Amino acid sequence: MMVFQSFILGNLVSLCMKIINSVVVVGLYYGFLTTFSIGPSYLFLLRARVMDEGEEGTEKKVSATTGFIAGQLMMFISIYYAPLHLALGRPHTITVLALPYLLFHFFWNNHKHFFDYGSTTRNEMRNLRIQCVFLNNLIFQLFNHFILPSSMLARLVNIYMFRCNNKMLFVTSSFVGWLIGHILFMKWVGLVLVWIQQNNSIRSNVVIRSNKYKFLVSELRNSMARIFSILLFITCVYYLGRIPSPIFTKKLKGTSETGGTKQDQEVSTEEAPFPSLFSEEGEDLDKIDEMEEIRVNGKDKINKDDEFHVRTYYNYKTVSENLYGNKENSNLEFFKIKKKEDHFLWFEKPFVTLVFDYKRWNRPNRYIKNDKIENIVRNEMSQYFFYTCQSDGKERISFTYPPNLSTFFEMIQKRIPSFTKEKKTFDQVSTYWSLIHEEKRENLKKEFLNRIEALDKEWSVENILEKTTRFCYNEAKKEYLPKIYDPFLHGISRGRIKKLPPFQIITETYRKNNLGGSWINKIHGLLLKINYKKFEQTIEKFNRKSLSIEKKLSFFSEPQQEEKINSEEEIKTFKFLFDIVRTDSNDQTLIKNFMDFPEINKKVPRWSYKLISELEELEGENEENVPMEPGIRSRKAKRVVVFTDKEPHGEIYTNLKDNQNSDQNDEMALIRYSQQSDFRREIIKGSMRSQRRKTVIWEFFQAKVHSPLFFDRIDKLFFFSFDIWGLKKKIIKNFIWKKKIDKKEEEQSKREETRRIEIAETWDSFLFAQIIRGSLLVTQSILRKYIILPLLIIIKNSVRMLLFQFPEWSQDLKDWKREMHVKCTYNGVQLSETEFPRNWLTDGIQIKILFPFYLKPWHKSKFQASQKARLKKTKDKGEKNDFCFLTVWGMETELPFGSAQRKPSFFEPISKELKKRIKKLKKKSFVVLKIFKERAPIFLKVAKETKNWILKNFIFIKGISKRNLIPLFGPREIYELNEPKKDSIISNQMIHELSVQNKSLEWTNSSLSEKKIKNLIDRKKTIRNQIEEISKEKQNLTNSCTKLRYDSKIIESSKKIWQTFKRKNTRLIRKSIFFFKFCIEQMSIAIFLGIINIPRITTQLFFESTKKILDKYIYKNEENGEKKKNTLYFISTIKNLISNKKKMSYDLCSLSQAYVFYKLSQIKVSNFCKLKAVLEYNICITSFFVKNKIKVFFQEHGIFHYELKNKTFLNSEVNQWKNWLRSQYQYNLPQISWARLVTQNWKNKINKDSLVLNPSLTKEDSYEKKKFDNYKKQKFFEADSLLNPKHNVKKDSIYNLFCYKSIHSTEKNFDMSIGIALDNCLVSSFLEKYNIRGMGEIRHRKYLDWRILNFWFTKKVTIEPWVDTKSKKKYINTKVQNYQKIDKITQTDLANKKRNFFDWMGMNEEILNQRITNFEFFFFPEFFLFSSTYKMKPWVIPIKLLLLNFNENINVNKKIIRKKKGFIPSNEKESLRFYNLNKEEKESAGQVELESDKETKRNPEAARLNQEKNIEENFAESTIKKRKNKKQYKSNTEAELDLFLTRYSRFQLRWNCFFNQKILNNVKVYCLLVRLNNPNEIAVSSIERGEMSLDILMIEKNFTFAKLMKKGILIIEPVRLSVQNDGQLIIYRTIGISLVHKNKHKISKRYKKKSYINKKFFEKSITKYQNKTVNKKKNNYDFFVPEKILSPKRRREFRILICFNLKKKNARDTNSRFDKNIQNLTTVLHKKKDLDLDKDKNNLINLKSFLWPNFKLEDLACMNRYWFNTTNGNHFSMIRIRMYTRFPIP
């Protein structure tokens, strides 16, 4: 059941796949997509559906739809039917028919209303309205102008047409698919229209409620047809505008018009591409370029100047009689063109040639030429032409077949039937093809084996290597063509015939000596099956001695017989098939032999114009034979005339007298370039601009324009990333540091400069902008000088006269006359007051105002100021310029196009004077005010008392009149106890009066209120006394009155409280104003003080935090040698670690052991002193001879484990290392520190991306073993270090040395060199383990990034700045001592090994000298290496793109082992001394390869003496050699210049930006001085003002580049050439990304076994000069390869021929040869017993893998087209390219 279900499911899937891939479904899909290519034809269709109504409207809809579908059907049929496709595919045919029809249709509908039909059904046939609608839709569908520019939608059917077999079914299904899409589209349009008509909301918005607009709406509806016509016309004109109009296109003068000669045009070419049938340029598709004239008389001369003729001689009588047997066809007339009179010549050219000149520049073509004489051959667009050809012995369709060749072949077949090819069967063709190439392969194989045998016999290299075949044009002198022109070296397509030197007169002698005939093979392979051997290596043909091919074959190749063609038929056939370029017209023998041969003249497409650029026009305006109008746009440049000397005299005349042009002597001009990007550069005028449809430009000036598709290539986008650390740092910096004024001014000046440049470029970019601007400037200058300023002077003096002041006519007129308006160039170079710049209307102008006039209200008196005042004035105004530039708006600016300056105000001095006078008046009135102030208090006091008395009486009288109360001061009665009401009334009355009096305080002044308060107090006292008397009188009353007395006491107390509250309230109101003022002042002071203290507090916190952070890592050495920490502890104690509840499992192996020992070396080892005797004999120690106390001590510290018998100190396991490390209290790290050091993300990244598969402590010697051992699988477990005892001995010996040094140290402070040396040794060991030093030798590793290596690989003493010593002197001594010890210790058994060390550190030395701020990477270098390596992931970059500077330092005979206080080379001494003086200076850049030997350890003293002697001898010898070879330079600048000039062949000079402004200022002053008669005074004044700089004046006449570079004026740099990437480079870069070697991330089975190479075999072939001693640069890519015996051309041929099985007839398609299923073939070299190689098989495999790097991509690239005559591009698909192995030799 399951099998049945799977069977059904598989059938369904296969059925679905077949349906999807069927021709019908694909045709429906492509046809449906074609619907979206909407064009102008839809306008007619939509108009008929929208506006036509009624019965006639329905008929019009039907006719429009029918015409639309019929037009599209014709377009689909034209794909299959060739004549219809040619008729519709000719752009000129459609264009010529479309333009008149469009004009007719536009004017026909322009005078009629759409709804005014005026006809009935009976005259419809007469009006032809329905038929016109049908024709409109049909014709416009054929026009095929797309709304989408360059739309691919309509071309999809054409593209897929050639991929299917059943073409008719595909065309039919495509049309059906288009029809379905069209019906759906029209239905959707109809639904939208119905929805609009039915939707009331839309209709209500359209209703016009005003009668005023109804007429306009009706007119709009009536003119709808006209609107449609206008839209259609504009659309078609726009798409015709994509092709330059034949009428308005810029006419270019031909060669005959510019004075060209026939000799200028006769230059040969090999290819003649022609216009394509599918071209969009509007070029002629008739075979104009293929027109060939047959001249019966061979003596006729060719008079056309702009044609290049290829003449072919053949005996038409003999050929027709012998080959064809038909005398009537003897003329072989391909095209007959009758000669006419000269005045009828314009009738000869077709109409298309007159209207559409195909030679016109219709595309943005670049005009590339070699010399000024010749015209460029027209290079057409790449064309797709399908034709059958042979490929690999089979007939195949090629889509890049030359159309002219196919036309010529069809022409030959029609005229010469016997030349028709005989169709052979597939087996015959394949067999014939296989036999040819098999025989060719055998010859190459035999020759190659002979050469290898000669190599075994140790023959001379000159006889073994194959000679390169070169093209020789002078056999006697052995003169060859240059390599770039040699077709044997660079392929046939690149061959060029040597051109004449420019402006050389061709004489008869030159013709005889230098020009000869040549045979060019054209089309023989197409027409005849010529024997391959017969014509392959024919040296001489027809005994022509003027041309020969020098081909030196070595004695190994079999001599091939030179066959001469003897039979007449072969001669005639050969002459017919080979074109002869007759360049020697004096060769009479040649003419006699072929006198009866007529000529076939073939015109090569060549531009008939001689174009020059605009820059060439500016450079040579007055030269002869140069066209006046440039045809090529250059970079925007303007010729600015700086100086015009009408009377040449003196030195200027003597310097310029050699120039022939007298007018040029009078001018000094500069060329000014525009600073904006110019896309028109090198484009021919009248051509179209490139269609940048995918670029987005959002700024006015944008440097790097690219498509939005590549936004992901940008490093950081501001809206996708937010750098919080950078923002935080910026905020802290802004809080701590104040912004400097200089920086602000600099930024402001930069912004101003950018703004000025933008304004200048804007004026320069628009058309007629300079004319408008120049006119405005001149107008503003005239208005200012002669109208505005005189008018202001008149108004000012008139006002002064009205104000009875003296006028200042003379002073104002003097200042007005002093103002000068100097005309300047566009850059601001001043000329004179009357002289205008040349072409100032087009180039631009500036007007500079010297001593500008400012209107002043009055002039100061002319008394002489003191010297001090004058100096102060000049100092204040020293920076102020006494000139300005005029703007378009009449304003003044300091620089051209700068911001407007503020003029001195006319009224500002008046306001200042008024203020001064007011101040004087105040001073005079001060005395009067003082007297008044003294007498004022008396007067105020009298007035106050009078006022108070009046108010008092008034209030008293008013109170009496209002109420009839008992007077307080009059007679009164004592109330009885039964009358308590009156007392309450009295009290109430007093309270009421008090409240009334308090209210009165609001409107009385302070004096009145005080008086009133005083009166009230008196009254209160009186009332209080009266109350007391009354209370005393009532004390004698009965007990019944006690309650009343108690109540009265309460009332009295409440009265007192209320009165006190009132009194305090009054005082508080009076004093509240001052209280509020005081509070506000205190608050403002507190806020201000807080703001002031914020920077101080933040600064203090910042420094405290940084101090705390730094104190974690810095330790001080006290006098007693004990270690103490400053503030915070870097490593916590054991108690803190135990107290943590949550423990982590730490990987102690990730710690750098170098850092551990470095820290331990700083700890005083006092307890080890008593154990010296034990440790001196630690090799023989066992647990029986050691005391238990010492055992316990060692076990506690993890030094020895005596339980492990026969285990010495050197053979400790990883667990012992961990336990000992944990016993040290410094490494009981807290949780935070471990989290920072051992990051989980980092560990994951290392496990994921690490190239080294074993991250344990095992370190393999990468130089002792092959580099492929890194790919050997190793298990990861703890005791893995015991697997490689050799390496462990080497590693642990370093530790042993460290322990020995630390224990036997007699000094209190431990020598720090041990820790440094140990770290350096471990780093070098780490490099060896991960094979970083041998990265260049690993061929499978296609990348190398120098940034993965840290600073200490070149600087051995870089760790020393962190070592503290007691004094500076001791520090210096320790440094030199440490340097020696490092060199001594790091020589660890690397002798007798050739080192390859890339000098990647030289790429960027600045990074090496930077100080390290990240302490993690300093103490843990292994972290830094891998983390920085795999952040960049550079393995997709090919190695040759990165290793551009591949340097290798080889030190073979130099063995450097230095004693402790012994010999140091002088260059290193100098570097050490310089390093001690300034730490930031660079050290000596050379990499010293250290070597050591095992004998050094056994007998160090003897080895040291021998090594020292060898060092001194080698060093002295090397220094002598260096002095002989090295060129002596006086300074580094000369050496750098010489090095630069030898390295770069082209360079340019750029002056320093610091001197740029100074030089320009000097130029401006010079331009002014050369016009003056007496320039001395102006020169002195300009020097005083600082306008002229004397320090950059060139006193010497001849300056060398070195002197200029020393002065800092010129900076030399390579030329930024525009790189034109060739096809090979593009293919290499494209495929280099996909060619990621599989060994990057997985283990290859090929490298499981270790391999060794016996180097004895190679030492024989190494010459003597290769055994160098010092600094030998070597390229591993040039290593000897046996295949290089052959030449590169034959090498490729040999590789390709041996990869195919030619004997197999039923071979598969060529694409299958690159399938993945094919197994890798064996190697090329068979293992031969007589070869002196190692017997191990792996050595040979590794050798060949290492020596054969350059045979992969280029073989595939040239395989099809070059070797097997294959033009089918499908055979070379980059997707199937793979890295294949060598091919065998059968």
From Swiss-Prot:
Mode of membrane association: Multi-pass membrane protein
Membrane listed as a keyword: yes
Biological process according to GO: protein import into chloroplast stroma
Pfam families: Ycf1
Transmembrane segments: 19-39, 68-88, 91-111, 133-153, 176-196, 227-247
Keyword terms, alphabetized: Chloroplast, Coiled coil, Membrane, Plastid, Plastid inner membrane, Protein transport, Transmembrane, Transmembrane helix, Transport
Protein family according to the UniProt entry: Belongs to the TIC214 family.
Purpose of the protein: Involved in protein precursor import into chloroplasts. May be part of an intermediate translocation complex acting as a protein-conducting channel at the inner envelope.
Miscellaneous notes: There is a partial copy of the N-terminus (positions 1-343) of ycf1 in the inverted repeat (ycf1-A, BAA84433).
Identification of the protein by name: Protein TIC 214
Lineage, highest ranks first: Eukaryota, Viridiplantae, Streptophyta, Embryophyta, Tracheophyta
